[in-house]
Every structure is written in structure tokens, then in C-alpha cells.
Amino acid sequence: MHILIISISYFLGSLPTGFLFGKFLKNIDLRLTGSGSTGATNVLRNVGKWPAFFVFIIDVGKGLIAVKIAQHYTNQNLFEVLAGIAAISGHIWPIWLKGKGGKAVATGLGMFIALSWKIGFASLGIFLIILAKSKIVSLSSISAAIFLPFLMFLDIGSTNHPYFFISLVVSILVIWKHRTNIRRLLKGEELKINDINK
């Protein structure tokens, strides 16, 4: 059962939401357009606001549902975390798109809302505050990722817990996936949310 749920979590995470919206609505391959990501930000810039909104909601749902399925069948924190990791892995490295997917932000948010809604919404709050000030999605995502392990530690009071471990892993993973964005930020070349193309 555990292996089955982990597999389901991966395939759930690997649903290429942004790619499908790009293909069906604009006949474009997001992997070859803009930032090359299939996430909501690239959808926003190249497909439209409403498609981006739906992609974001669905991608959040992928992480949330994967963890909720695990929670339904077990009360083991480690197993919940493994299901979340599987969903995030599917989102970043989807088998359908030869391993080229999104950057784990929305799916990771869904996972943390399921694991600890306080941490999930606190991270979302940090993201929205930075976004309101900077208008730069990548900076907002990176900022939320940096704060994530600290928020989790404050919530559970321990570094020896699967939730803290996954918060640290996801933080590092999100920052790593934004490494090209970081280079542009340092050069002052990163575009803002209302810019059309990267």
C-alpha cells in the first residue's frame, strides 16, 4: 500500500497542468517559451491570467491531495513527507515531459498546507508580502523558501522531525530551481510579474 500511494503521489504531481494549458489554449510548448518552466508564472506571461490562476490552484492541489491520501491511510509523519516528496518530484521531473516541469513552489505550498496549515499559509503570506513590494515572483518564492525551515522549527520546536527535514529539503530545492533567477536578480535583470516575456 505504501509503495502504491507513493507512486500515485508521483503521478499526481507529474500531471503537466501548465504544459496542457499552454498547448490547448495557445498551441505553445512552455518548455520552449519564456523561462522554460511549466509553472503558473510562465503560464501568466505566455498564456494569460485566468489560465495561470487555474494552474496555480491545480498545482497546489496536487501537493495537498498527495499528502491527504497518505494521511488517510497512515498516521506516520515520515510517510506523509515521502508522499509529499513524491508529488514535488513529479511536478519538477514529470515523466510525461522528459523531466522538465515546474519549480515546486505551488505543489510545495499544497504539501505544507496539508502537513501544517499554519506553516503553509504563513509561507504564502511571506510570498504575497514580498510580491506586493517587489512585483518579482522569483524573489517572493525564494524569500518564502528561505523562511520555511525557520517557520517549521518555530512550530514544532525540533530539528529532529520529518516535517523539519522536508521543510529544509524543499527550501534548498526551490532555491536551487531558481538559480538562474538568482543570477538575474543579482544583475538587476529579473523581470516583474507584469512583464510579458523573459
UniProtKB/Swiss-Prot annotation:
It is an enzyme of class 2 (transferase). The keyword Cell membrane applies. Disulfide bonds: none annotated. GO terms for biological process: phospholipid biosynthetic process. Pfam families: G3P_acyltransf. Keywords: Cell inner membrane, Cell membrane, Lipid biosynthesis, Lipid metabolism, Membrane, Phospholipid biosynthesis, Phospholipid metabolism, Transferase, Transmembrane, Transmembrane helix. GO terms for cellular component: plasma membrane. Probably interacts with PlsX. Belongs to the PlsY family. This is Glycerol-3-phosphate acyltransferase. The lineage of its organism: Bacteria, Bacillati, Cyanobacteriota, Cyanophyceae, Synechococcales. The gene is plsY.
